[in-house]
Amino acid sequence: MSEPGKRQRFSPYKSHRNYRTIRGTDAGLTLRHFDRSRRKYRLFGKLSDDAVAYLLMGISGVICVVLLLCLANCVSGCIHGCTRQDTTSSQTNELDSRVEAQTSQNLTRQFTDVLNYADNITWIAAHAHSYRDERLPELALREQEAAPFVRSILDSSITAPASDISPEQGSMPTCYTWDGLWGSTSYGQGTIATDGSGLVSWYMIRAMLLGDGSQTPVDFAEQAHEYADDTCGTRGEFFTQHAKEAGLSIKEYSVSLDNLKLSCDGDKKLALVCLKEGATSPYQHWAVVARVNKNSTVSLYDPASKKATDATWEQNQLVDKISKLYTVSALS
């Protein structure tokens, strides 16, 4: 402390003092000086520069090999794909060109049936409103085999499939209302295809019991014109009144399981039945029960439904679907 009243004296500035202070020598300290040029951060640790160079060259080589392999694989795939496409395109399925070549014959035929149906039903759907009788497109929807016939009603470029029937006594032919031989013939409120189940059933019965196919459903349509109705399509009186003329004997029975068995027992008698609405189709119609099989099932020949004809029927299952029952045999 300076004495009061006396002017404080300042020593001259000594630059070397400030330097020592900065260096820390005034306080007796010795600072460590880092050489920043020596602080190098190395990616590969203590490896030498030559080792690092060799390592980078190795990695680059591996990457090049991988890229070359990928490129070769892509080129090979493209060549193989083009070759396969050319080979496939040069081959066609002999049975149906719409099905891939080398497909088995059995599978090809199955595809053909479905593809043909798809083609027909698509055409029918596009012209559905043009049909005067809505039951015709309904028939095509319900029965796949009927689609070509239904289409042929409006499409003149299509010929409806027709059966080649050679009636033989003792052999029951399988016939349907939509057959090209008679399906489009006018009958009742529509055609034989929609209303002629009784006429086709009568034809099958005569073919089975008499071996006679001289008269077809077209002929019966003229004979039964007065008997057409909106229930089963044909009234039962047509059969009872024309049986003798046709060389047949017919008798009506009440519907029961016993009477059904009796009506189609053996090869000499057949049962002519009217099936109820909704039994095998949305409408009442006629069908034929041919025989009782060994396993107690019965054979149904339904001219309005291939699905029903192909099915196996238990007797008690079928009898519940019958509204009228006639026994028919050859006139002795």
Positions of PLM-derived features:
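N-terminal targeting leaders characterized by basic, low-complexity, disordered sequences
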Residues: 1-47
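Conserved active-site-adjacent core of cysteine acyl-enzyme catalytic domains
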Residues: 2-3, 32-35, 42, 69-107, ...
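Short linear sequence elements within intrinsically disordered, low-complexity coil regions
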Residues: 5, 15-18, 24, 39, ...
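Intrinsically disordered, low-complexity regions
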Residues: 6, 25, 29, 46, ...
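A generic structural signal for solvent-exposed, polar alpha-helical segments
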Residues: 16-19, 25, 129, 155, ...
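Active-site-adjacent structural segments surrounding the nucleophilic cysteine of cysteine proteases
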Residues: 45-47, 51, 55-61, 68-228
